[in-house]
Amino acid sequence: MRKKAPPLAIAFLLIVAASTSYAAGKRITKLYVSNSEGDNITVIDLATYTVIGDIRVGEQVHGLCAPSDGRRLFTTIESENNLKVIDTTTDKVVETIPLTGRPNQCASTPDGRYVCVPIRNGNSVDIVDIAARKVVKVLPVALPHNCYDADNDDAMFVSSMGDQEINLIDLKKMAYAKKIPVGGIPRPYAVSKDGKRLYAALSDFHGFVIASIPDQKIVARVELPPAPPLACRLEPHTPTHGIELSPDGKELWVTSLADSGVYVYDIATNHLSTAIHVGKCPNWITFSPDGRYGAVSNSGSDDSSIIDTRTRREIARVKVGKGPKRLLAVTVP
């Protein structure tokens, strides 16, 4: 009598088969989720809402970023002070680049030439030349936390928690071009496609601020609806954390850790249009490149909510690793 394969073996074969299918040329969109209290990145197929892989990268995995071609994924590892390069076809680490200190959230230029990495314990930001495989410039910044790409190959943003501002870096000159005050300790933020508006979440504020980048000043302060007291272990002082513009640039999606929800704002009016319930303590938010799906990392329930952006409803909740933090959707060629 033929023996049945054990469940774990079947699961392993399914993952291998899926990976082989993707490597053979099927174009898919993968959601990568960094598990900050573990050593891994969970990989989810956004078309089926299923886990298709697990990438072991090192303890205290933090940042995720990628160039526009989707061929590589960059991740920062706090415990190792390095930046790792992942081939998105195989989901294997192919390169490790040393950094000058403990890294936080990274950002890549669209062409993948440079990666910006805040160095929290160095009060600085590393500019990494990926082709040269090394840090080529270190700029001073007080308590840096998040880098954000400027949607072009010549500029990058980095937030300063110490100076309560967000700085624009000119990558041609390798120097600061602008410093935009945000009126509080900046957490995640988003930048409009035309480069004129900046939307930032702040510590101890259940809402966000809007700043003019050309004028380098705050132009609006928007409070989210009232919510219960914040009780989230990973983000105890940030009731509003995840913040992202929809791919068409018309809406701002903001997570409320205090209310386990996602709030959608029309950026033309700054008016709330939709509230979506998700998992506990929603941390970060991202979109698939085509705007079809939104995804949220729920740090309080160790899962990720998948949202249909047309119906404005959560359509799946996928279990991931411990303490999910950053997440990024990448369409793999």
Predicted regions span which residues?
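Bacterial N-terminal signal peptides
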Residues: 9-17
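Predominantly soluble domains enriched in secretory-pathway, periplasmic, or organellar proteins
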Residues: 19-333
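Bacterial N-terminal signal peptides that target proteins for export
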Residues: 1-9
